[in-house]
């Protein structure tokens, strides 16, 4: 290969005139250095590689110009079958199966064949020819190490040739291309299906308009129907708002801070008002349910443990009389928390279950309320029949009796 002159050095012409002499060695001849740089010949890196390759081949006793080491030559010893008793030898002392891979050999080393430029320093690893592992005397004498065979199939298959390797390599390449093509088709179908799904919702309105035009032929009527449908929906939601306002008014719950929408309001404003009124109505109802359930439990404890019954194995007689009054005070301060707890419980319940939850505590509390009223009436009647001498004393006794029975 001929040396190639790099013409980029021409750009340095006259550079010595631009240099500052104060920063340059006085003994240096700038003009001479410029001439050396301008006329320097530089070769490609491949030339250095070829020199190393030729030196390695010479040390191994290989001549690239010899037809015996050429795959294209019919007289090549590499393509011949080796002969011998238990030894696989070829010309030059290189075994047939010592330079091979398991399945598909590379272009440079396959089926025991050695192309021009295939043996390089340190390029063949693990069971092949390493730099310095094959001695000069062993190559010249035709002897190599034993046990460098790749696998048992390469030992037994004496007729394994380069064409077989190429055939297997081509088959593997074809199978890989087939696998890639199948995967690409699958991804393409998945992407197309995803794009269709994403397009369908956005074209729903357009499809409705096209169908309407095909049937009626008047686009204005289509938009008129759509406007009428929206107006009807607003009227239904406004009626729901009026019902909620009525319920909250009966419970004496203020709604002055909520702006009531009209038919001209947007759908979003109407939905926001419905949500606020629903939360306010449901919050009161849910807190009432929690209060009734907990007060019912307190009433049950008062009936069971009134100070006369003893707990077995504990020798303890608890008296929970008046516990429901304490519960009422505590629960009134926690109306928001109780409404949240009940709301989470009844969120997924059916309407029938909600009705049972509303009426269940009342069924338990009703007998206790009736008994309290009857007891208050009897005490007041007995007090009036007694007829105390001092009217102020009678008034105080009546007041204390009513206060006691109302607890």
UniProtKB/Swiss-Prot annotation:
This is Uncharacterized protein B407L. Residues 73-93, 116-202 are annotated as: Disordered. Residues 112-136 are annotated as: 5 X 5 AA tandem repeats of G-[S]-[IV]-R-[DNS]. Residues 187-202 have a biased composition (Basic and acidic residues). Sequence repeats lie at residues 112-116, 117-121, 122-126, 127-131, 132-136. Belongs to the asfivirus B407L family. Disulfide bonds: none annotated. The keyword Repeat applies. The keyword Repeat applies.
